[in-house]
């Protein structure tokens, strides 16, 4: 089943024809429709079986198809993984990895580490590069941006300073007050002669309308939608979304992290008057990788719409090689997605957390780890490492919230500490290890970020920003409630059943 939604539409078309032709025979119609549904369910089950998914995901799909067949088929049409699209993404990966290697080959001497790092950090940079991450870059400065006010102020300031190009990419971009403010800043720079490229995800930014985008097009801004959910086939599966958030100005200043563009990310919503998030500003050599990732996504999403090629971007205007001579530490940027089987971000997080000797602190809005991640955290806690997980006390997803809590029992019993952020919504995606190494980016601690979404994280080694991250953690803990095992185990049977059910269906979504 290359396109599940197409098969469903064909099925319902056939059923409609049969309803018209066989309206005199209720029994025949009932038998025919029943047989048709049975064949569909068996076919979907076979596809799921041969895809070699995780046992949890396979079991979840089988149970839903068996117990709720109609709902199960509809869910598969929307959330099922499309093999033809998977192959398309894998083909993209191979081509673009080769091109990125060419970029790095031309900058090999520039990318050699010159700042001394400790032995563990050096080892991690080498391991992560084998996982598919870019080379670690020194002569790069980073600045932690806490929450939306700091982040959007810095981004707007950088946009205002742009001289050659602005590349902007978001999963969610809303046409509200801050979205309009950023848009108008881009329009002004485009009118000034700056090249502006705007890339947004077809699902996350599905509320963007023509009347909002038209002034951008009229100003000369190039706009591309990443994998539209509506196409000539009416509806695509919603998997394989681009969850990355990237802004690059002149190849010299970059931004990435947890924040999308919208008023709610500034704490302007009634539901979440406080939106706790973290973003990162990057200047220096690490921009090589960030720029390459944006261009990979741009060339993929715009294929067929224009005649761009990598050759047009392989120059100093897009890869200027700006260096910050007095910078400390190093930065390593890692990207992953369905275009690779490497699970680069998941493996990077495992390597970073697995190197811990004293502490592992995690902030994530959704905690639905795979078995390897859960086992590592549990064993680390048993070994006496200070394992802490900070998650939102009030979530924007009941499924993720309840599913997350189903993983708390083995961690609490192992000695880990879990904190529920009580001031608002905790949306930061950060890992801090031993106060010396940290990761910050777009990836949640869940299977969707590890396997299905296009994500990006930055690994920070021995820099001031790592200490700033620790400072934010310590402040966040003050605004959180620690979940104690004695009280947590007293949850009602109804609550435990709900958690288990949400955990069961979470691999589907």
From Swiss-Prot:
Q: Name the residues that span the membrane.
A: 4-24, 30-50, 59-79
Check the record and name the InterPro entries matching this protein. Cardiolipin_synth_Firmi, Cardiolipin_synthase, CLS_N, PLD-like_dom, PLipase_D/transphosphatidylase
Q: Which UniProt keywords apply?
A: Cell membrane, Lipid biosynthesis, Lipid metabolism, Membrane, Phospholipid biosynthesis, Phospholipid metabolism, Repeat, Transferase, Transmembrane, Transmembrane helix
Q: Mind telling me which CDD domains this protein's record contains?
A: PLDc_CLS_1 (cd09110), PLDc_CLS_2 (cd09112)
Task: Give an example GO biological process.
Answer: cardiolipin biosynthetic process
- Keyword Transport appears in the UniProt entry: no
Question: The organism sits in which domain of life?
Answer: Bacteria
What is the annotated role of this protein in its UniProt record?
Catalyzes the reversible phosphatidyl group transfer from one phosphatidylglycerol molecule to another to form cardiolipin (CL) (diphosphatidylglycerol) and glycerol.
Task: Name the chain's protein.
Answer: Cardiolipin synthase 1
Q: Which organism is it from?
A: Bacillus cereus (strain ATCC 14579 / DSM 31 / CCUG 7414 / JCM 2152 / NBRC 15305 / NCIMB 9373 / NCTC 2599 / NRRL B-3711)
